[in-house]
Amino acid sequence: MSLAPSVIEPAHEEDAFMDLLATSALDDPLAAARDATADMLRQRQGDHSLPQPFYNDPRVFALEMREIFEHEWLFVGMTCEIPAKGNYLTVQIGDNPIIVVRGDQGTIHAFHNVCRHRGSRLCTQAKGKVAKLVCPYHQWTYELDGRLLFAGQDMGEDFDLGAHGLKPVAVTHAGGFLFVSLADQPPAIDDFLATLDDYLAPYEMDNVKVAAESNIVEQANWKLVIENNRECYHCNGAHPELLNSLIEYDDTDDPRATPAYRDLVARQQAHWEQQQVPWALKRFGKRNRLTRTPMIEGVVSMTMDGRPASQRLMGRLPNPDMGSLRILHLPNSWNHFMGDHAVVFRVLPLGPQQTLVTTKWLVHRDAQEGVDYDPEWMRKVWDATTDQDRQLAEENQRGINSVAYQPGPYSRTYEFGVIDFVDWYSDTMLSRLDAEAPSLHIVQG
């Protein structure tokens, strides 16, 4: 049975998926799901949303957690959150608890947050500061570089401390962003990181702090959260607060861009050039992009009135009129950097229909709450926008769960960013599913 959306009746896409699972030559359910998922990806209709199982099936979710979230570089936090030796942050990536900690000479380490004794989590708080990493269960004690220092009582004469250090996780950072990858061989990212460093150099990311943080759980698949972010087709009807400052166009390459917008961009780019801040659009495939775009003329910050949220500007920026430096990192982050503050977003799947969205507002390290900025005022635009997006994603999920759902067409004019994301997702998943397929085939002797 074909899985192409143009052939399968909408009400039977899940049936087709189940048929492939049932007829797979392998007994392992995840291997069977792999074959069925790869087949759906090969036959999916371009410029359309994905078939229903990609948004609600636990087996597809398990596959994409393995092939994407346990493989890609994921944004997990900011270096300013672990400023000194012993500072740590934790993050949950699927079933995998991870700890990122600052060690000697400022070195940043990442480990599986799992004791090598009996598997208990070491650090249970989101953030903290410790002299050593100590398991709360039996007090096994680790150095900040992961070496096991103490293993309790009577482990036997042959017990080897050196063989029981914490299991490391790949970690890197640039422009104040922390990224981890659970893969043994993470994908190449150096070009993007170098550009991230260059574009954020004027913001002096060693001198920022988190002024506010929000964590909300959306009852929607993580891809719906990202899809919603990758277009502003919905903005006029959903985001009055955001449109006080944001211009919907993504860049001058946006097919909707008007001559007036291109003129504004040209004037702003001349201003940014004079201020010596990078602005040119940079793409790294469909996974990463950076671009500086103007806001509504006369607006300098994403606030309710367009005025700065912080009187202390970021880094060495000479004035607040810096537009919005937009940074996209798939699969789990989008960001806006303005002259006075920045807003960074992190997306982490919790289940097939549940996603954690974390928002952090950054200001200059020396900005004083109550003097230079009011965190509640700073948050208003994106608190409202994120909640509106939550409602949109959740209603999208409810509709997709219906037997009436079938993949719908994207607009190349308004939803080109969604097309890019879904294409990136599909290509990435398919290449990795195909790459591992031979090792799972049963060979008859």
Curated annotation (Swiss-Prot):
Binding site for Fe cation: H234, H239
Keyword NAD set for record: yes
Stretches assigned to the Rieske domain: 73-180
Keywords from the UniProt entry: 2Fe-2S, Iron, Iron-sulfur, Metal-binding, Monooxygenase, NAD, Oxidoreductase
Cofactor: binding details: Binds 1 [2Fe-2S] cluster per subunit. Binds 1 Fe cation per subunit.
Temperature dependence: Optimum temperature is 30 degrees Celsius.
pH dependence: Optimum pH is 7.5.
Cofactor: [2Fe-2S] cluster; Fe cation
EC category name: oxidoreductase
Phenotypic consequence of gene deletion: Can use glucose or dimethylglycine as the sole carbon source, but is incapable of growth on glycine betaine as the sole source of carbon.
Activation/inhibition comment: Activity is absolutely dependent on the presence of BmoB. Glycine betaine monooxygenase activity is significantly enhanced by Fe(2+) and severely inhibited by heavy-metal ions, including Co(2+), Mn(2+), Zn(2+), Cu(2+) and Ag(+). Severely inhibited by EDTA.
Binding-site positions, [2Fe-2S] cluster: C115, H117, C135, H138
Protein name: Glycine betaine monooxygenase oxygenase subunit
Name of the gene: bmoA
